[in-house]
A protein has these predicted regions:
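Membrane-interface helix-start motif
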Residues: 135-140
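Soluble sensory domains of the PAS superfamily and closely related sensory modules
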Residues: 15, 25, 29, 79-99
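Extracellular/periplasmic ligand-binding regions of membrane signal-transduction receptors
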Residues: 3-33
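Short loop/turn segments at beta-alpha junctions that line or gate ligand-sensing/allosteric surfaces
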Residues: 75-76, 99-106
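Short, hydrophobic beta-strand elements of compact beta-sandwich sensory domains
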Residues: 1, 15, 112-134
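A short beta-strand signature within small-molecule sensing/ligand-binding domains used
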Residues: 46, 106-116
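Extracytoplasmic ligand-binding sensor domains of the Cache superfamily
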Residues: 38-92
């Protein structure tokens, strides 16, 4: 049985592969693959995102048209919290960050968690999963 949603383990693995590709090929070349809707970096509801310290998206795997937009413009997302906590996780070498965002499928505010890695000191790369009701435990 294949779940309709990606899992935390799959998000973690996707971010690790994506960060390795950026290191090998550079962000511009990697972004082409991250934005390919049938590519290796899109899996069900999972996709890669990258943004800089100002909160500007440089990659938004599910919606490439959001590149250049700000985390502050994402409906139902606390941009200040996300920016602060994602970069704090990156400064620790990577980690999980829990937050709330409007689920684009249901329109409800849902809990989400994203695995974040640093891309140098000025960018973060990540992938998130909506948390099931009742939660789950994360290990990284």
């Amino acid at each position: 049985i294949r779940l309709r949603r990606g899992t935390a383990d799959e998000a973690y693995a996707l971010v690790a592969r994506a960060a390795a590709l950026v290191e090998q090929a550079g962000l511009a070349q990697a972004a082409v693959q991250f934005h390919d809707p049938s590519g290796a970096f899109r899996d069900r509801d999972q996709y890669i995102f990258v943004f800089d310290r100002s909160g500007t998206y440089q990659v938004f795997g599910s919606t490439p048209g959001n590149v250049g937009k700000s985390v502050f413009d994402v409906r139902g997302l606390d941009g200040d919290f996300v920016l602060r906590e994602f970069f704090a996780a990156a400064q620790r070498g990577g980690g999980w960050v829990d937050y709330e965002v409007v689920n684009p499928v249901t329109g409800a505010v849902d809990e989400k968690t994203s695995y974040i890695l640093p891309l140098g000191s000025e960018r973060v790369i990540g992938c998130g999963v909506f948390k099931p009701k009742g939660g789950f435990s994360l290990q990284a």
